[in-house]
Amino acid sequence: LKCNKLIPLAYKTCPAGKNLCYKMYMVATP
């Protein structure tokens, strides 16, 4: 599963790494 930058809950459901998804979300969200 890839991190969805459009969904804030993506970082919670990302098994690859919460930090990675969180960063992706933060970048997508100014």
UniProtKB/Swiss-Prot annotation:
Subcellular location: Secreted; Target cell membrane
Cysteine-cysteine disulfides: C3-C21
Molecular function GO terms recorded: toxin activity
GO BP of this protein: killing of cells of another organism
GO (cellular component) term, any one: other organism cell membrane
Keyword annotations of the record: Cardiotoxin, Cytolysis, Disulfide bond, Membrane, Secreted, Target cell membrane, Target membrane, Toxin
Signal peptide range: none
Function of the molecule: Shows cytolytic activity on many different cells by forming pore in lipid membranes. In vivo, increases heart rate or kills the animal by cardiac arrest. In addition, it binds to heparin with high affinity, interacts with Kv channel-interacting protein 1 (KCNIP1) in a calcium-independent manner, and binds to integrin alpha-V/beta-3 (ITGAV/ITGB3) with moderate affinity.
Assembly mode: Monomer in solution; Homodimer and oligomer in the presence of negatively charged lipids forming a pore with a size ranging between 20 and 30 Angstroms.
Protein name: Cytotoxin 3a
Organism encoding this protein: Naja naja (Indian cobra)
